[in-house]
A protein has these predicted regions:
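A structural signal for conserved, well-ordered secondary-structure elements
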Residues: 1-81
Length: 81
């Protein structure tokens, strides 16, 4: 049968490309400030490419936040710093 792994647990995966080497600790801190303490932030490809994996998160109404909304929140936070 099908064996589930972390890739199938749900959530949002984002790939962000920077013009210069990414500061991973800063990216992690910015993502954690949004309430994603369990997010994974890592380089892939080059030091300028960052993959961010966000776990499923519920909104104030108890329903899961849409991936597009999560992505927009993270990109807004990363662009603000």
């Amino acid at each position: 049968g099908l064996h589930l792994s972390v890739e199938f647990t749900g959530g949002t995966v984002m790939e962000v490309a920077y013009t210069q080497a990414a500061d991973l600790p800063k990216v992690r801190a910015d993502v954690e400030k949004l309430g994603y303490a369990d997010a994974q932030v890592q380089n892939f490809g080059t030091s300028r490419d960052v993959m961010i994996r966000l776990p499923l998160k519920n909104g104030p109404d108890g329903k899961p936040i849409a991936s597009a909304v999560q992505s927009q929140q993270v990109m807004t936070a990363l662009n603000a710093t």
